[in-house]
Amino acid sequence: MSYENPPVPHEVNVSRESTLAQFLRLCAGIAVCIALASAVLWVAGGWLARLVPYSTERSMVGARVFGLDLLGEGDADGDPADHARIEAYLQSLASRLGAVMDLPEGMAPIAHFAEADLPNAFATLGGHLIVTRGLYRRMPSENALALVLAHEIGHLRARDPISAIGGGASVALLMALLAGDGHALLPQFARLVTLGYSRQAERRADDAALAAVIALYGHARGSEAVFRILAEHRGPAGLGDGPTLFSTHPADAARIARMEAAAATADADAALTPLQVAADAH
C-alpha cells in the first residue's frame, strides 16, 4: 500500500471576488443600516417631543429666541423706533390671528422683527416667530403678511419646531454613539427650526393659514402674493422653482395655484387691507 498527498486545489479558501468589492459592499451595508436607524430615530424623536407639554417647553425656553442669530446682522443703522413699531404691529396681528386659530390652552405666539435683508420668516421653540425686514418690506398688503404669520403660527400649533429638535437630537445621539463626539452637533440644533419641515407639515400649515386669513378678513385675496414674491426672490439667485420631491417646501407654482383657487372664491371687489406700519427699504 502506498500513500501520497493529493494535489490541493488552489481556489480553496480564496474568494473569487476582489477585496475592494467586499469592502465596498460592507460599507454600503453599514451606511444603509445607519440611514434606516437615523430615519427611525428622527420620526420617533419627533413624535416623543410633541408629547412634551407646551407649558414645559415655554418655561424651558423662556425669552430665548432660537435661530435668531442665524439670520445675519442686517442694517446696523436701522431706526430703533421704526423697529419697535413694526414689531408691535407684528405682535398685534399675530395675536389677532391666534384668536381665530384654536390654539392650545396657554399657547400665545410671540412675534419678533429681525433686521435681516433676506426675506424669511420661521417659527421656533417656545411660541416665538420671526419675520425679517427683507420679507416685511416686500409684503404688498396686510393680507399677505397675515398669511405668513398664520403659516408660522400653524407650525407652532402643530408643535413642528420642537418635533424638529426632538428628531435632530435623537439622530445626534446616534452619531455621538458611533463617532464618540456629540458636543459638536449640539450647536446645530437651533438651525433645524430654520431649515423647513416636511412637505406634509408645510401643506398643513398652509391650510391653517388660509383658514385663519379667511376667518379674519372674510376672504383669501392677497395670499398668493406671498409665494410669488418668494419665487421672484429665488429666481435671480438661480434657485428656481424645484420639484417638490427635492424640497421640504411644496413648489411655489403649486402653492400659488392653491392660494389663487382659495382667493377665487372671494368677491371680486373684496378689498385688501394695507399695511398699517410702513417699512423703510434701507
Question: Language-model features: where?
Answer:
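A Zn2+-metalloprotease active-site environment signal
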Residues: S2-H282
